[in-house]
């Protein structure tokens, strides 16, 4: 039996992978796990690997396609994954109850094993219970933190939830000027004592409120923990990670020597996207219209 408090199954699944549903990843190593005990996750994953997942989804009708290790349905639509899962539930004759919220999960005091699951409509006896509530990241899809209450009721110690795999909001009012830009770059996250907490590299997206993209997602949890501690982490963005600082300086000087009367805005054109270069100049208090000869 599945108890679902929303009016349909899979609302959160439909939002995964930007609506494409990457259902597993071929790159599964201990260092991919971001918690303190990598063995905890690693041992569990050995019982059902990425290859097992790909094979199982193929059996229920989902042809997989590989994008840099991310496994998507070949149709590139999360809806086909949801429909395949729903069809499998029907084949297995699994009873599904919609719009029925679980209120509590408790040990069955009348039996040596089993559980009593109480909902807003009824109660059920079960030998096994899988709590698949999600965290608190997407309340609109039903993840409102219920699972934490169920876990605490069984005596589990809870770690204060923090945001993860998310964009980072930056201070300042310049971000609207760079909104929409994507670059191949590297982000470094430091704590307020200038200690490096995390770094990652890949496609970075500039948005109106800050910075986003997979590299930012990967370091965001460390920023969230620092903010929970009332500390002030900061980001360093390398927008040209394939080039050294010395090489970039030489390029700027060479361009200035070639045409000292050109503006700074024109000087850095071709090195960076226009909007990003202008933001960098303004943050450094350099007038984009000033002449390049000033840097010689």
Label the predicted regions.
Residues 7-9, 14-15, 23-30, 157-160, ...:
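An anion/pyrophosphate-binding glycine-rich loop and adjacent beta-alpha core
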Residues 41-44, 71-76, 133-141:
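Flexible, glycine/proline-enriched loop segments at strand-loop-helix junctions
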Residues 2, 15, 66, 96-98, ...:
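General beta-strand structural signal in soluble alpha/beta enzymes
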Residues 47-128:
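Feature captures the FAD/FMN-dependent oxidoreductase FAD-binding
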Residues 1-3, 102, 123-140, 151-152, ...:
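Short hydrophobic core segments
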Residues 128-174:
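Glycine-rich loop(s) and the adjacent beta-strand/alpha-helix scaffold that form part
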Residues 63-86, 154, 158-178:
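Rossmann-like dinucleotide-binding cores of NAD(P)H-dependent redox enzymes
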Residues 18-68:
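Glycine-rich active-site loop/strand segments that organize a redox cofactor
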């Amino acid at each position: 039996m599945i108890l679902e408090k929303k009016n349909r199954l899979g609302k959160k699944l439909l939002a995964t992978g930007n609506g494409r549903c990457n259902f597993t990843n071929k790159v599964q190593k201990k260092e991919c796990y971001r918690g303190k005990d990598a063995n905890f996750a690693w041992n569990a994953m050995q019982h059902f690997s990425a290859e097992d997942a790909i094979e199982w989804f193929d059996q229920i009708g989902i042809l997989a396609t590989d994008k840099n290790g991310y496994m998507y349905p070949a149709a590139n639509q999360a809806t086909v994954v949801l429909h395949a899962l729903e069809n499998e539930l029907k084949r297995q004759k699994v009873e599904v109850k919609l719009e029925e919220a679980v209120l509590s999960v408790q040990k069955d005091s009348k039996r040596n094993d089993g559980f009593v699951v109480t909902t807003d409509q009824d109660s059920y006896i079960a030998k096994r219970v899988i709590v698949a509530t999600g965290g608190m990241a997407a309340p609109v899809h039903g993840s409102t933190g219920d699972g934490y209450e169920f876990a605490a009721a069984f005596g589990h110690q809870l770690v204060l939830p923090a945001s993860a795999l998310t964009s980072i909001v930056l201070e300042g009012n310049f971000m609207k000027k760079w909104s929409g830009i994507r670059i191949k770059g590297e982000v470094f996250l430091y704590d307020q004592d200038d200690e490096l907490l995390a770094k990652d590299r890949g496609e970075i997206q500039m948005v109106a409120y800050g910075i986003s993209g997979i590299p930012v997602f990967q370091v965001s949890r460390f920023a969230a923990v620092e903010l929970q501690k009332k500390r002030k982490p900061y980001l360093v963005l390398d927008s040209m990670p394939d080039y050294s600082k010395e090489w970039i300086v030489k390029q700027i000087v060479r361009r200035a020597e070639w045409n000292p009367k050109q503006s700074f805005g024109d000087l850095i054109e071709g090195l960076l996207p226009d909007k990003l270069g202008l933001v960098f100049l303004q943050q450094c208090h350099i007038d984009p219209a000033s002449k390049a000869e000033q840097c010689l």
